[in-house]
């Protein structure tokens, strides 16, 4: 029970922080336009109709496809989270699901995901992203690292 409550709290905190950051950045952008944080980082406004890196942004009915796909992935991860006995795995999955729900909320409300972090070196730009993308990526990396560690311990 404790694992479930903590997981739900983590999920909601991640989702809320994502939505708050997007609201704050949209207001900041409306007042100031693009903002240079430091030489390699700008805060911008980009509406991503595709998936990661803007892939498939021109896909016909893409938003509907991505919403359904997101919902299926969220359901699978939520089921996995419920079944896991590990608090750390549950928290990782909650971070991933919270980020995915944050981006899904954007798709439902705006028809696209709001990205605002632009990292670049000279003219080369990493695709813009947001806090939800960051939490999903970190959650996946930590989850995979835990799984690899678990498997190496089982094989030792």
From Swiss-Prot:
It is an enzyme of class 3 (hydrolase). One of its GO terms (cellular component) is plasma membrane. Pathway: Protein modification; lipoprotein biosynthesis (signal peptide cleavage). One of its GO terms (biological process) is proteolysis. Keywords: Aspartyl protease, Cell inner membrane, Cell membrane, Hydrolase, Membrane, Protease, Transmembrane, Transmembrane helix. It catalyses: Release of signal peptides from bacterial membrane prolipoproteins. Hydrolyzes -Xaa-Yaa-Zaa-|-(S,diacylglyceryl)Cys-, in which Xaa is hydrophobic (preferably Leu), and Yaa (Ala or Ser) and Zaa (Gly or Ala) have small, neutral side chains. GO terms for molecular function: aspartic-type endopeptidase activity. It is a multi-pass membrane protein. The chain crosses the membrane at residues 62-82, 126-146. The keyword Zinc does not apply. It comes from the Bacteria. It is found in: Cell inner membrane. Its EC number is 3.4.23.36. The active site is at 115, 133. Signal peptide: none annotated. InterPro entries: Peptidase_A8. This protein specifically catalyzes the removal of signal peptides from prolipoproteins. Belongs to the peptidase A8 family. NCBIfam families: lspA, PRK14775.1. This is Lipoprotein signal peptidase.
């Amino acid at each position: 029970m404790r694992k479930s409550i903590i997981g739900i709290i983590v999920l909601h905190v991640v989702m809320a922080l994502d939505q708050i950051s997007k609201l704050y950045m949209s207001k900041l952008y409306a007042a100031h336009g693009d903002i240079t944080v430091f030489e390699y980082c700008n805060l911008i406004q980009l509406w991503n109709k595709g998936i990661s890196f803007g892939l498939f942004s021109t896909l016909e009915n893409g938003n509907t496809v991505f919403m359904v796909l997101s919902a299926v992935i969220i359901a699978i991860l939520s089921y996995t989270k419920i079944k896991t006995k590990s608090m750390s795995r549950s928290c990782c999955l909650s971070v991933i699901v919270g980020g995915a729900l944050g981006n899904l909320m954007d798709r439902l409300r705006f028809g696209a995901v709001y990205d605002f972090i632009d990292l670049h070196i000279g003219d080369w730009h990493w695709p813009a992203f947001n806090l939800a993308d960051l939490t999903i990526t970190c959650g996946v990396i930590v989850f995979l690292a835990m799984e690899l560690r678990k498997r190496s311990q089982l094989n030792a």
